[in-house]
């Protein structure tokens, strides 16, 4: 049973990454112009200078944040499918509902984790107290922390999903 679940999650992850690449290439083809390309290059150079990080590091960090966010959405949807298909009636509606609830709980866990860290870190707590722009080091710390939090959430949700799948549920 665990192998079936892992094959489904792997196929979903591959489809997600393929979709991300196709969207990026499509946007590049549709919107490419020398002016836009120069604008993006100048913006990346400027932002990487402000954050004291290489352009590659900047792009990698943001791609990682987006990827773990989308993976959280993916595993939340799978959780919704598993819980929804355990019921006899309204499987699709319940799958969407449980998926949304799982995703909302994951986002609340991220927010709660950031708040808990903010209790000991005044820089991060500024997110909750003011609308001022964050210090560069605080923002970098926050991005790295969020990546770790999302990875923990993804692992926990997958452990729950494997447990539910092993108990028996027909998702075909």
Regions found by a protein language model. Name each.
Residues 10-81:
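Secretory targeting signals
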Residues 45-51, 120-142:
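Short, membrane-exposed interhelical loops at transmembrane-helix boundaries
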Residues 63-71, 100, 148-152:
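Hydrophobic alpha-helical transmembrane segments of multi-pass membrane proteins
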Residues 1-13:
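Helix-loop-helix units of permease transmembrane domains in multi-pass membrane transporters
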Residues 56-60, 132-149:
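Membrane-embedded or membrane-proximal helical elements that form or frame transporter/channel pores
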Residues 92-105:
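Central hydrophobic cores of alpha-helical transmembrane segments
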């Amino acid at each position: 049973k665990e192998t079936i679940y892992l094959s489904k999650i792997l196929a979903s992850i591959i489809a997600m990454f393929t979709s991300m690449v196709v969207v990026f290439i499509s946007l590049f083809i549709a919107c490419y112009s020398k002016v836009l390309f120069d604008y993006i290059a100048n913006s990346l150079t400027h932002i990487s200078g402000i954050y004291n990080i290489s352009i590659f590091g900047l792009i990698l960090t943001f791609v990682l944040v987006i990827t773990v966010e989308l993976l959280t959405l993916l595993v939340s949807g799978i959780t919704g499918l598993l819980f929804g298909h355990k019921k006899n009636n309204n499987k699709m509606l319940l799958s969407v509902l449980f998926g949304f609830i799982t995703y909302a709980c994951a986002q609340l866990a991220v927010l709660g984790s950031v708040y808990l860290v903010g209790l000991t870190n005044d820089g991060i707590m500024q997110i909750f107290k003011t609308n001022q722009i964050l210090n560069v080091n605080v923002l970098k710390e926050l991005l790295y922390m969020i990546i770790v939090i999302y990875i923990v959430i993804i692992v926990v949700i997958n452990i729950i999903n494997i447990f539910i799948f092993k108990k028996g549920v027909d998702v075909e």
